[in-house]
Amino acid sequence: MNDTILRHQRMLEKFPENELARFSLGKAWFDAGEHVKAKEQFEIALRKKPDWMVVQILIGKCDLSLGHREAAMAAFTRARQLAIDQHHDGPLAEMEQALGELNAGG
């Protein structure tokens, strides 16, 4: 386990209800390639804040890396709608590209 993960685990232990601490731990797991552990943290964060677009995108990326194509498509579709609702052009383009590639079988 790397120092970044340990630091974020300690922060979450101190502040278990802090969504940013939970997101940071999930992102540390994601960056370490531990997509199952990352997704667990992201799903908890998303339950507390269902409109968190970045978390929704990362859940889709976790699913994709784990070979869960249908789940990734569902996550990216939700993220696309959040990007539209929140007027985020960059993430919208990213989700449209990801969905296009998944629909094309890529």
Regions inferred by a protein language model and the residue ranges of each:
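Structural marker of alpha-solenoid helical repeat scaffolds
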Residues: 14, 48, 82-86
